Structure formats: C-alpha cells, structure tokens
C-alpha cells in the first residue's frame, strides 16, 4: 500500500475511470522522460558496471544493472528525499552510515545521488546504487551522475 502525499502547488493529472469516478494522480515531469531515463541508466551501467537509476521526487522510475525487482516503481526513502531537497550531489563516504534508496528495501544504498534541477525546482535524482557496506563511489561515478542530472534538467526545460 503506497500513498503519495500531495502538497500545496503540486501539479495533478485528473482521470475518470469507467464508472465515472475521478482519479487524481500526482504529475511527475521527469516521468515523461521514462524511456529516455531507462536508456540513460543502461548507458551508465555499461560505462561503470554498476547499478544506475533515475527517480522522480516520489519513486524510482528507471534502473539498470540490478535491483530492478526490489526498487523499480518503489517509493524513495525519506533520506533520499532530504538529499534531493538539499540540491547538492551526495556521495557515500567510507565509515558513514548507509542511506537506503527506498523505504521498501534497505539492502540497496545510495553511493552517489545527483539532484535533477529544472527551472529552479528539484524534479528527481540520478543515482548510483550499491549493496550495504560496499566501497564508496569513484570520482568518475560522481561526475557522471552530476553530468547526467544537469543534462536531464536542461532537457526538461526545453
């Protein structure tokens, strides 16, 4: 059972079902890039041999390299939400506590998280993911996540 909290000012999509009932769904601009995000994740996986993902502010929308069953379309953790709100690229450090990607699965943790910012708003995040107690990400993964997040932000502006 999963509920997305709708805050004041969040865009909504409104649908009707076959019985005429109204369905309100939180609109995700980065979700519009779903196929594109999946291709980016696959490219990042091939380049780094790691697990790469893209999420919007609520759920993981694309993933490649593993953990698809455990994380795809699962809600992001509160800690990941805080990282996105902070608007800075995060990198897990040796000896630091692990930050889970999703509240639904504590096995997979954030190695690098780069927020996607478009027109001043946080839209989501580009992630490199590892299992708990894995070594920290390299500078290459850090810069790749940062570059892809900047690129996605620019794509959403056009």
Residue ranges with predicted function:
Residues 30-32, 38-105:
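Structured interaction and signal-relay segments at domain junctions
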Residues 31-43, 73-82, 90, 125-158:
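Juxtadomain coupling helices with adjacent low-complexity linkers
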Residues 1-5:
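Short beta-strand-centered segments at strand-helix junctions
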Residues 20, 116-126:
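Short hydrophobic/glycine-rich mini-motifs in sensory/regulatory modules
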Residues 105-117:
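A short beta-strand signature within small-molecule sensing/ligand-binding domains used
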Residues 10, 16-27:
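Short, basic amphipathic alpha-helical segments that act as recognition/interaction helices
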């Amino acid at each position: 059972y999963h509920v997305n909290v709708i805050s004041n000012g969040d865009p909504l999509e409104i649908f009707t079902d076959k019985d005429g009932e109204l369905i309100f769904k939180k609109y995700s601009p980065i979700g519009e890039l779903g196929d594109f995000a999946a291709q980016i994740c696959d490219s990042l996986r091939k380049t780094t041999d790691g697990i790469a993902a893209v999420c919007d502010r609520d759920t993981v929308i694309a993933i490649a390299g593993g953990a698809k069953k455990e994380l795809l379309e699962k809600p992001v953790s509160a800690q990941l939400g805080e990282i996105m709100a902070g608007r800075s690229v995060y990198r897990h450090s040796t000896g630091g506590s692990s930050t889970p990607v999703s509240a639904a699965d504590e096995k997979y943790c954030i190695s690098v998280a780069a927020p996607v910012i478009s027109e001043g708003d946080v839209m989501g995040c580009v992630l490199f993911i590892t299992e708990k107690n894995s070594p920290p990400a390299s500078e290459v993964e850090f810069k790749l996540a940062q570059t892809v997040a900047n690129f996605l932000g620019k794509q959403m502006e056009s």
